[in-house]
Amino acid sequence: WIMGHMVNAIEQVDEFLNLGANAIEFDIDFDKDGIAQITHHGIPCDCGRKCTKKAIFTECLDNIRQVTTPDDPKFREQLVLLALDLKLQRISSAKAYRAGEDVAKKLLDHYWQRGNSRARAYILLNIPLVEDYEFIRAFKDTLKNEGYESYNDKVGINFTGNEDLDKIRDVLEILGIHKQVWQADGITSCFARGTERLKEALEKRDTPGYNYINKVYAWTLVRKSIMRRSLRLGVDGVMSNNPDRVIKVLKEKEFADKFRLATYNDNPWEKFRG
């Protein structure tokens, strides 16, 4: 999976897909009451990027619904995964439950259209810190209460704050989540990051019977040397400001026979068995 990073303006969706991304990540900003308002990262952000692009969240969902719906004029077959980077660290943890309710309802109304949409992308909920786990509980409660619990099959969980992996496992255990879990490891493209935690996540992913990590991705990679390093370690995905660079690396002799771009037929919740 090649995730286009910080795709917050509607016009950026096609831009990143044209560069080769098959997944996009966008930032969801909340008001003080936990209501999702806009897709917006803000300052600071990655080096070489404009941090201020934005869109109304519901308008973003309406557009992406079209882009991921077969036979729609806007349909782009390659876009199979949406990563929602939830900026919960900007609001009180006490509002995390309200935020989860709101995002679930907006997805129901604007993306899935309560069963009337054929939009098919998988959705990854990126939670910044384990202290905000009530967002996940609220999201699942809302799908159940609204009568659309089946959409859980399309939704995965990912904690992005580089926290202790055992601590993350404990929270997932509290929530009763034993599947559909991704694990991110990374840092802004402005800085270098070692591989110790990334290797630990990959080791846990590959441990038989360990159900708290199904996929691992590294972020935010812009240098080809770091992309190569991550691929050699065996990551499932790369988040990048430059998907075209990832495409070029994947075509290199070392990787061409080992990796390919994920398609809709690849289940993002299953561990890869090479």
From Swiss-Prot:
**Which pairs of positions does the record mark as disulfide bonds?**
C45-C51, C47-C190
Q: What class of enzyme is it?
A: lyase
| CDD domains given in the database record | GDPD_like_SMaseD_PLD (cd08576)
Q: Which domain of life is it from?
A: Eukaryota
- Example GO BP: lipid catabolic process
Write down the EC number.
Answer: 4.6.1.-
A GO cellular component annotated for this chain's UniProt record is: extracellular region
Instruction: Give the co-factor note.
Output: Binds 1 Mg(2+) ion per subunit.
User: For this protein, what is any one GO molecular function term?
Assistant: lyase activity
Q: In which tissues is it expressed?
A: Expressed by the venom gland.
* Cofactor(s) the record lists: Mg(2+)
- Keywords, sorted A to Z: Cytolysis, Dermonecrotic toxin, Disulfide bond, Hemolysis, Lipid degradation, Lipid metabolism, Lyase, Magnesium, Metal-binding, Secreted, Toxin
What are the positions of the active site?
Answer: H5, H41
Q: What is its main location?
A: secreted
Which subcellular locations apply to this protein? Answer: Secreted
Q: Any idea which positions bind Mg(2+)?
A: E25, D27, D85
- What does this protein's UniProt record list under function? Dermonecrotic toxins cleave the phosphodiester linkage between the phosphate and headgroup of certain phospholipids (sphingolipid and lysolipid substrates), forming an alcohol (often choline) and a cyclic phosphate. This toxin acts on sphingomyelin (SM). It may also act on ceramide phosphoethanolamine (CPE), lysophosphatidylcholine (LPC) and lysophosphatidylethanolamine (LPE), but not on lysophosphatidylserine (LPS), and lysophosphatidylglycerol (LPG). It acts by transphosphatidylation, releasing exclusively cyclic phosphate products as second products.
Q: Which family does it belong to?
A: Belongs to the arthropod phospholipase D family. Class II subfamily.
Name the chain's protein.
Dermonecrotic toxin SdSicTox-betaIIB1biii
**Organism, scientific name:** Sicarius cf. damarensis (strain GJB-2008) (Six-eyed sand spider)
Q: What is the lineage of its organism?
A: Eukaryota, Metazoa, Ecdysozoa, Arthropoda, Chelicerata
